[in-house]
């Protein structure tokens, strides 16, 4: 049977993979956004695990709010990336430091 520790270890592994993904790939914005989404998934896993094992529904409800914010963040981030790609023909992070406003 799976215990709370199994889910917490899974969440920690997912969180660590996302941190490694951010630090190893600092050039591609899409991979950075995917790593941030994986980080939010790890947090959601911990919320659901604590909610289930403590018998409280608040953690599961909070997951829906986090998923909503993550979806909005992904949509806005991808819209910004499309705009940057159309104007600069690249999504390389090193080339995005010359923004004009």
Swiss-Prot record:
Tell me how this protein sits in the membrane.
Multi-pass membrane protein
UniProt KW keywords: Cell inner membrane, Cell membrane, Membrane, NAD, Quinone, Translocase, Transmembrane, Transmembrane helix, Transport, Ubiquinone
Q: What is its main location?
A: membrane
What Enzyme Commission number(s) does the record list for this chain? 7.1.1.-
Keyword NAD assigned: yes
Q: Name one GO molecular function term.
A: NADH:ubiquinone reductase (non-electrogenic) activity
**Where do the TM regions start and end?**
4-24, 30-50, 61-81
| One GO cellular component term | plasma membrane
Extract the InterPro entries matched here. NADH_UbQ_OxRdtase_chain4L/K, NUOK/Mnh_C1-like
Pfam families, per this entry?
Oxidored_q2
Entry keyword annotation includes Transmembrane? yes
Reactions catalysed, semicolon-separated, are: a quinone + NADH + 5 H(+)(in) = a quinol + NAD(+) + 4 H(+)(out)
One of the GO BP terms on file: ATP synthesis coupled electron transport
Subcellular location field: Cell inner membrane
From what superkingdom does this record's organism come? Bacteria
PANTHER family, alphabetically?
NADH DEHYDROGENASE SUBUNIT 4L-RELATED, NADH-UBIQUINONE OXIDOREDUCTASE SUBUNIT ND4L
| Subunit details | NDH-1 is composed of 14 different subunits. Subunits NuoA, H, J, K, L, M, N constitute the membrane sector of the complex.
Q: What does this protein do?
A: NDH-1 shuttles electrons from NADH, via FMN and iron-sulfur (Fe-S) centers, to quinones in the respiratory chain. The immediate electron acceptor for the enzyme in this species is believed to be ubiquinone. Couples the redox reaction to proton translocation (for every two electrons transferred, four hydrogen ions are translocated across the cytoplasmic membrane), and thus conserves the redox energy in a proton gradient.
Q: What HAMAP family would the database entry show?
A: NDH1_NuoK
Q: What is this protein called?
A: NADH-quinone oxidoreductase subunit K
- What gene name is given for the protein in this entry? nuoK
């Amino acid at each position: 049977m799976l215990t709370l520790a199994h889910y917490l270890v899974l969440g920690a592994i997912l969180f660590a993979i996302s941190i490694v993904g951010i630090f190893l790939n600092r050039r591609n914005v899409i991979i950075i956004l995917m790593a941030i989404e994986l980080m939010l998934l790890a947090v959601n896993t911990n919320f659901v695990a604590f909610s289930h094992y403590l018998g409280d529904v608040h953690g599961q409800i909070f997951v829906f709010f986090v998923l909503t914010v993550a979806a909005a963040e992904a949509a806005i981030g991808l819209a910004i990336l499309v705009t940057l790609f159309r104007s600069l023909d690249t999504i390389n992070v090193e080339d995005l430091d010359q923004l004009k406003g």
